[in-house]
């Protein structure tokens, strides 16, 4: 995931100031651009030097061959004149008066210089890449420039009534329908572990089937992806911070051989976007094949580092969940990827409209975008029980930022072109099931239970096609009852203690005559 290096090179038509401005707008380190330009300049010098040295090496070999053919004396002295030690400026005329022994000495010096230059070049290449991978994609002009997501995300539009208030939040409702077991889940899997139960298992499967059916009707190719990826491939689709904050590492044996002691490092996927991005790795895509649409279904795994204390109850923010993802490879020309961007968020909106879930579309501020996204729109559903908007969908156009490192190229092979072009890659959530379940529970709650949204009824079993009935009391009501009971008991105890104290005072104040 990187920008085109030519964007940093003024002699190639690039303008580093444009990228500096992008870094400023992203509220990221601007000095990375200057460090990269310096490293790239030194790298290009090394490559130029290496080219000259290789020419010198070939010249030495040719001169030795000619002298041997002419049977000239080999010579014993390998002392070199000063002009023969200027390796990058060697010419046939410089080598002509030298003996074979002297030219062989020149070739040894050239080999040593090549080795040092290659070492310097590789070091600079690694340094340049470290800077490059931390510089974000160019921003779309419509992105709001701010580092305050809460205050400055721009609401583009809303759908449905986003003012409705209802009694219970999803935290209570998952318990009331007996569709969730959190305590046992935490014992088995640790924090945020859970078992989905009974009616919510069916509701989740209904959402999956309905979402896939819609995407299939829109010419998406369905993919059930691997759940883990090799480290070297994951490095091409995930930014560095994700390895520390989001991804789970899996360690296994290097092969299936019993005597193999090597270690194989893999990473659990955080979204099916990651394996689908690599699905066409190293391929050339013809213009007439685009756009290529994929609908990814997978379990997703996220560490949620930095989310301590947020959404600790219920199933809204968990370490493991099912998700259907839209992923598209698009042409880099004529704004085609931006047309696809609008289509993808429109597909997601249509899905939630048919479910009857109110929402708003939010344009995310520059400072909150990941490196790859040129622009991101979120669909935030209205949760009437929680009295809040919560994110259900993220739709991003990453332009050619991801494709470059994955080497997914556009058009003809490089032999037919001056320079390889890369496809544009876009992703958008269709349905993260646990979050959508939470939204359905809050929006469709009644006194008796949860009304099943019309499009999902066909996927639900007999007895659950119309309503998922409440079978347990709301935890919040039980907590309130306990508090009230405790307060009442405390009041009685205080009153009783107060009566005893009055009696003791009277006894102490009694005189002999009183008795």
Swiss-Prot record:
Biased-composition ranges, Basic and acidic residues, are 479-507
Which residues make up the binding site for L-serine? 271, 302, 325, 427
> Alphabetically, which GO biological process terms does the record hold?
angiogenesis; branching involved in blood vessel morphogenesis; cerebellum vasculature development; cytoplasmic translation; negative regulation of angiogenesis; negative regulation of sprouting angiogenesis; negative regulation of transcription by RNA polymerase II; negative regulation of vascular endothelial growth factor production
NCBIfam families in alphabetical order:
serS
Entry's Gene Ontology cellular component terms: cytosol; nucleus
Task: Please quote what the entry notes about the protein's domains.
Answer: Consists of two distinct domains, a catalytic core and a N-terminal extension that is involved in tRNA binding.
Q: Where is this site: Important for serine binding?
A: 429
Reactions performed catalytically: tRNA(Ser) + L-serine + ATP = L-seryl-tRNA(Ser) + AMP + diphosphate + H(+); tRNA(Sec) + L-serine + ATP = L-seryl-tRNA(Sec) + AMP + diphosphate + H(+)
> Which protein, by its recorded name, is this?
Serine--tRNA ligase, cytoplasmic
Reported EC number(s) for this entry are 6.1.1.11
Q: Where is this region: Disordered?
A: 475-515
- Which UniProt keywords are given for this protein, alphabetically ordered? Aminoacyl-tRNA synthetase, ATP-binding, Cytoplasm, DNA-binding, Ligase, Nucleotide-binding, Nucleus, Protein biosynthesis
Protein localization: Cytoplasm; Nucleus
Broad class of the protein's primary localization = cytoplasm
UniProt-listed Gene3D superfamilies: Bira Bifunctional Protein, Domain 2 (3.30.930.10), Serine-tRNA synthetase, tRNA binding domain (1.10.287.40)
Q: Where is motif Nuclear localization signal found? A: 482-494
**Looking at the record, which segments are called Interaction with tRNA?**
9-61
Indicate the family of this protein: Belongs to the class-II aminoacyl-tRNA synthetase family. Type-1 seryl-tRNA synthetase subfamily.
Q: Which GO terms describe its molecular function?
A: ATP binding; RNA polymerase II cis-regulatory region sequence-specific DNA binding; serine-tRNA ligase activity; tRNA binding
Upon deletion of the gene, what happens? Answer: Morpholino knockdown causes aberrant angiogenesis with excessive intersegmental vessel branching, due to excessive expression of vegfa.
Annotated residues for binding of ATP: 302-304, 318-321, 391-394
What is the annotated role of this protein in its UniProt record?
Answer: Catalyzes the attachment of serine to tRNA(Ser) in a two-step reaction: serine is first activated by ATP to form Ser-AMP and then transferred to the acceptor end of tRNA(Ser). Is probably also able to aminoacylate tRNA(Sec) with serine, to form the misacylated tRNA L-seryl-tRNA(Sec), which will be further converted into selenocysteinyl-tRNA(Sec). In the nucleus, binds to the vegfa core promoter and prevents myc binding and transcriptional activation by myc. Thereby inhibits the production of vegfa and sprouting angiogenesis mediated by vegfa.
Check the record and name the PANTHER family matching this protein: SERYL-TRNA SYNTHETASE (PTHR11778)
């Amino acid at each position: 995931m990187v920008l085109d290096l030519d964007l940093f090179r003024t002699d190639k038509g690039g303008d580093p100031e444009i990228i500096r401005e992008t870094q400023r707008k992203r509220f990221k380190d601007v000095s990375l651009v200057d460090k990269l330009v310096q490293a790239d300049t030194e790298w290009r010098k090394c490559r130029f030097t290496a080219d000259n040295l290789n020419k010198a090496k070939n010249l030495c070999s040719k001169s030795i061959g000619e002298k041997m053919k002419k049977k000239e004396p080999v010579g014993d002295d390998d002392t070199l004149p000063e002009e023969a030690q200027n390796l990058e400026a060697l010419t046939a005329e410089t080598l002509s008066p030298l003996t074979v022994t002297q030219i062989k000495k020149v070739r040894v010096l050239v080999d040593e210089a090549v080795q040092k230059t290659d070492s310097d070049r590789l070091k600079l290449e690694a340094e340049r890449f470290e800077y490059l991978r931390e510089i974000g994609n160019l921003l779309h002009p419509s992105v709001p420039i701010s580092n305050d997501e809460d205050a400055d995300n721009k609401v583009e539009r809303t759908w449905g009534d986003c003012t409705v208030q209802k009694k219970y939040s999803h935290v209570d409702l998952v318990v009331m329908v007996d569709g969730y077991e959190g305590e046992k889940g935490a014992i088995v899997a640790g924090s945020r572990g859970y078992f989905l139960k009974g009616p919510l298992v069916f509701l989740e499967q209904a959402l999956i089937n309905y979402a896939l059916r819609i995407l299939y009707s829109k010419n998406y190719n369905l993919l059930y992806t691997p759940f883990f990826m090799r480290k070297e491939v994951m490095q091409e689709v995930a930014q560095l911070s994700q390895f520390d904050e989001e991804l789970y590492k899996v360690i296994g044996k290097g092969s299936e051989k019993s005597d193999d002691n090597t270690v194989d490092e893999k990473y659990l996927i955080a979204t099916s976007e990651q394996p689908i991005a690599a699905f066409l790795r190293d391929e050339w895509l013809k213009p007439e094949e685009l756009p290529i649409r994929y609908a990814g279904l997978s379990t997703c795994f996220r560490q949620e580092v930095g989310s301590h204390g947020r959404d600790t109850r219920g199933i809204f923010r968990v370490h493991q969940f099912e998700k259907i993802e839209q992923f598209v490879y698009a042409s880099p020309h004529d704004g085609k990827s931006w047309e696809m961007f609008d289509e993808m968020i429109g597909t997601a909106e249509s899905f939630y409209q048919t479910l009857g879930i109110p929402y708003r579309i939010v344009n995310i501020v520059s400072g909150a975008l990941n490196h790859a996204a040129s622009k991101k729109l979120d669909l935030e559903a209205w949760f009437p029980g929680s009295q809040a908007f919560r994110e259900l969908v993220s739709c991003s156009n990453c332009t050619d930022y991801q494709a470059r490192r994955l080497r997914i190229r556009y058009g003809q092979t490089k032999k037919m072109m001056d320079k390889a072009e890369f496809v544009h890659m876009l992703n958008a959530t269709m349905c993260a099931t646990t979050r959508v379940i939470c939204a359905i529970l809050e929006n469709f709650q009644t006194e008796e239970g949860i009304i099943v949204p019309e499009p999902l009824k066909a996927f639900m079993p007999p007895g659950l096609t119309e309503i998922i009935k409440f079978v347990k009391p709301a935890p919040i009501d039980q907590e309130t009852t306990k508090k009230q009971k405790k307060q009442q008991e405390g009041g009685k105890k205080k009153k009783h203690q107060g009566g005893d104290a009055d009696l003791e005072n009277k006894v102490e104040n009694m005189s002999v005559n009183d008795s």
